[in-house]
């Protein structure tokens, strides 16, 4: 318990199951929100609990929820997973009424890609329902809750009754041995029908009524749907499991292949096997060992180190996607920007002017550099293993904010602030600083959780290239800015 709460702050309940709760939590080190499935051991079988964790450890697909860390105590198991910023498919359809075919197709393609990946790994979900599918704001689909999932061999039949009634297959309702992969195919049919009609085909909590509906109604598909879609739904929801297609066969159905959309790439790597050097270096400043970072990712240990790396990387990418609000400028005065001197850069990345050029401003203008005394304008550029790059687009305006972004490997850039009091008006527009002004080395990092959080925040801001650090590391250094 203490191990979990030392790393995460529990916030609120966002989901409830038979023997588990899903909580919203905050990772103390990065401030990133995560979803935590809390499973009480005494309230359910332990083997299925670990089975869900083991299944998620085997998966790495853009349309399957990512497991980041597993923390086990004497009484509970904590599954720390990425937080989906969106709604369940059920809520999404409830708000929309139902989806047009062109709207449903890209969502269904993502589901097919995820389930085909699972079946190729020998994993079956067995609980594909609109509540277990998340739709994020950008339209990406995520399959969640592998609590009823398991691993099987091709041709292996089961007779364990473990499904929710409205989505149960005929073979399960009539207590027949079943192929678990065909259970998922039926689930895909139920989900597709719900997307294009806004209704659950067989909606009852009674087993007897459900049996009668399946036998009597078969599968009534609205005539307003296209012929291809009607055919696909009937194939998916065939009451004879042997006649149901495999997921791979569904992926080449004419309705699925219509249009130019492509299926998600299952080889897309969400948990890298090798750490990014810049992120690893930032983590080194807060106590993580480089070898431990590499081993945790390569061996997929799902420990504190692996979770911290993945959440830090996610936070960096999220911050770099945000536009930066600049202060109003006087169009008659050219802004003077410069790169901070290497000795004051917290990540310890030192570059000299003799190294190969790798970062230039897009307007190709010379930029005065603040540092030692100089009477010439210089242009400095940096090179290095860039991780994050952003386009630059600057338009100085008066009394109006604008967006400024950087181009190139931006983790090595930082801009110093200039004050009007230090401009030397006797020079010909050149700026210099006193040689006696020496940068003061940054003070030691604060102790405790808050100190660690501030440290990782400062490191992330530097990696995000344009967000200023909250920590003051230039004490005693004079700064110069243009006189307006």
From Swiss-Prot:
**PANTHER family the record matches:** MAP/MICROTUBULE AFFINITY-REGULATING KINASE, SPERM MOTILITY KINASE 3A
- Ranges for domain Protein kinase come to 8-256
Which spans of this chain does the record mark as coiled coil?
none
What protein name is recorded for this chain?
A: Sperm motility kinase Tcr mutant form
Q: Which GO terms describe its molecular function?
A: ATP binding; protein serine kinase activity; protein serine/threonine kinase activity; protein tyrosine kinase activity
Stated role: While the main function of Smoks is to control sperm motility, the role of Smok-Tcr, with reduced kinase activity, is to counterbalance a signaling impairment caused by the distorter/sterility loci, giving t-sperm an advantage in reaching the oocytes. Transmission ratio distortion also called segregation distortion is the name given to the phenomenon above-mentioned. Being associated with the T-complex, it allows males heterozygous for a complete t-haplotype to preferentially transmit the t-haplotype chromosome.
Tissue expression as described in the entry: Testis-specific. Expressed in the testis from 22 days postpartum (22 dpp). Expressed late in spermiogenesis, only in Tcr-containing t-haplotypes.
Alphabetical list of Pfam families matching this protein: Pkinase
The positions annotated for binding ATP are 14-22, 37
Q: Indicate, by first and last residue, each region the UniProt record lists as having compositional bias (Polar residues).
A: 391-400
The record's annotation in PROSITE patterns points to: PROTEIN_KINASE_DOM, PROTEIN_KINASE_TYR
The UniProt catalytic activity note for this protein reads: L-seryl-[protein] + ATP = O-phospho-L-seryl-[protein] + ADP + H(+); L-threonyl-[protein] + ATP = O-phospho-L-threonyl-[protein] + ADP + H(+)
For the region Disordered, what residue ranges are annotated?
Answer: 355-400, 426-446
Tell me which family the UniProt entry assigns to this protein: Belongs to the protein kinase superfamily. Tyr protein kinase family. Smok subfamily.
The remark listed among the other comments is: Encoded on the T-complex, a region of 20-30 Mb on proximal third of mouse chromosome 17. Naturally occurring variant forms of the T-complex, known as complete t-haplotypes, are found in wild mouse populations. The t-haplotypes contain at least four nonoverlapping inversions that suppress recombination with the wild-type chromosome, and lock into strong linkage disequilibrium loci affecting normal transmission of the chromosome, male gametogenesis and embryonic development.
Domain of life of the organism encoding this protein? Eukaryota
Instruction: Quote the InterPro entries the UniProt record gives.
Output: Kinase-like_dom_sf, Prot_kinase_dom, Tyr_kinase_AS
**Catalytic residues (UniProt):** 127 (proton acceptor)
């Amino acid at each position: 318990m203490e191990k979990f709460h030392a790393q995460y702050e529990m916030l609120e309940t966002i989901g409830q199951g038979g023997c588990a709760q899903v909580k919203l939590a905050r990772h103390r080190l990065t401030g990133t929100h995560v979803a935590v499935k809390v499973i009480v051991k005494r309230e359910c079988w332990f083997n299925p609990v670990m089975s869900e964790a083991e299944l998620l450890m085997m998966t790495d697909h853009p349309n399957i929820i990512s497991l980041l860390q597993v923390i086990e105590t004497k009484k509970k198991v904590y599954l720390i997973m990425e937080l989906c910023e969106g709604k369940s498919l059920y809520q999404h359809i409830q708000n929309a009424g139902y989806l047009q075919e062109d709207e449903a197709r890209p969502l269904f393609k993502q589901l097919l890609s995820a389930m085909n990946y699972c079946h190729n790994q020998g994993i079956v979900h067995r609980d594909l329902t609109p509540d277990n599918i998340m739709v994020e704001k950008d339209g990406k689909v995520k399959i969640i809750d592998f609590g009823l999932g398991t691993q099987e061999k091709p041709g292996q039949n089961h007779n364990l009754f473990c499904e929710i009634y409205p989505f149960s297959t005929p073979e399960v309702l009539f207590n027949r041995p079943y192929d678990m992969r065909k259970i998922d195919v039926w689930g895909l049919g139920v989900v597709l029908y719900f997307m294009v009609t806004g209704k659950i085909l067989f909606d009852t909590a009674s087993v007897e009524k459900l049996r009668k509906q399946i036998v009597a109604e078969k599968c009534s598909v609205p005539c307003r749907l296209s012929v291809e879609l009607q055919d696909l739904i009937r194939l998916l929801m065939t009451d004879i499991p042997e006649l149901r297609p495999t997921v791979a066969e569904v992926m080449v159905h004419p309705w699925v292949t219509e249009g130019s959309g492509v299926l998600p790439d299952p080889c897309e790597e969400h948990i890298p096997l090798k750490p990014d050097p810049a992120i690893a270096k930032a983590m080194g400043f807060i106590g993580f060992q480089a070898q431990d970072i590499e081993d945790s990712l390569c061996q997929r240990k799902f420990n504190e180190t692996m979770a911290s790396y993945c959440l830090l990387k996610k936070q960096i990418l999220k911050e770099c996607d945000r536009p930066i609000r600049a202060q109003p400028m006087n169009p008659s005065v050219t802004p003077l920007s410069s790169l901070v001197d290497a000795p004051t850069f917290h990540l310890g990345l030192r570059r000299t002017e003799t190294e190969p050029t790798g970062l230039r401003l897009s307007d190709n203008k010379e930029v005065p550099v603040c540092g030692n005394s100089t009477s010439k304008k210089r242009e400095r550029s940096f090179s290095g293993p860039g991780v994050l790059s952003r386009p630059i687009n600057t338009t100085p305006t008066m009394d109006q904010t604008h967006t400024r972004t950087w181009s190139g490997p931006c983790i090595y850039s930082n801009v110093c602030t200039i004050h009007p009091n230090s401009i030397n008006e006797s020079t010909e527009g050149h700026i210099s600083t006193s040689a006696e002004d020496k940068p003061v080395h940054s003070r030691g990092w604060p102790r405790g959780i808050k100190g660690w959080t501030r440290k990782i925040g400062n490191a992330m801001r530097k990696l995000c290239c344009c967000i200023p650090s909250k920590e003051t590391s230039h004490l005693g250094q004079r700064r110069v800015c243009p006189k307006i």
